[in-house]
């Protein structure tokens, strides 16, 4: 009887902890089965990558496994897409990420960290310039910020062909 109680308690504990573990990983979008070509799947993933992420949840923003690792994976795949698909993904991302100040600050700092650091393995001036172009057009940045962004964009473009 005691063994049965311990066994059931163990499974109840595992069941209670399982949702917590699942919430600590980035909520990737599911690709529709109707998308057959690589280009269609890439475009969908680029534009819908952030659909399940709650930008207003400060706990998700502070969670490195969700916000930072999700962002790192996002910029990694953007570098593999052509410019048009990458730009659509960045536009979809910034439309959501910059609406709230905490998420704007978080992701702006991650963009700087991964793209401005010359030692960063994620550094990619082509993708960085796409982020900066989108930020320069965004209504969520004031004129002073846009001036700084314009300078960074000019510097990033120097390394492009």
What are these regions (language model features)?
Residues 1-25:
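Bacterial Sec-dependent N-terminal signal peptides
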Residues 23-161:
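Oxidative protein folding and maturation machinery
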């Amino acid at each position: 009887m005691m063994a049965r109680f311990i066994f059931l308690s163990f499974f109840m504990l595992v069941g209670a902890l399982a949702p917590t573990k699942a919430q600590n990983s980035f909520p990737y979008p599911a690709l529709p089965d109707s998308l057959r070509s690589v280009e269609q799947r890439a475009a969908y993933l680029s534009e819908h990558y952030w659909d399940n992420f709650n930008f207003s949840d400060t706990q998700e923003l502070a969670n490195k496994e969700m916000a930072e690792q999700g962002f790192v994976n996002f910029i990694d795949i953007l570098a593999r897409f052509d410019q048009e698909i990458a730009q659509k993904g960045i536009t979809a991302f910034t439309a959501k990420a910059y609406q709230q100040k905490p998420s704007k600050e978080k992701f702006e700092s991650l963009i700087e960290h991964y793209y401005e650091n010359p030692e960063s393995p994620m550094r990619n001036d082509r993708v960085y310039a796409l982020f900066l172009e989108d930020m320069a057009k965004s209504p969520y940045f004031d004129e002073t910020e846009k001036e700084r962004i314009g300078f960074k964009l000019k510097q990033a473009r120097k390394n492009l062909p």
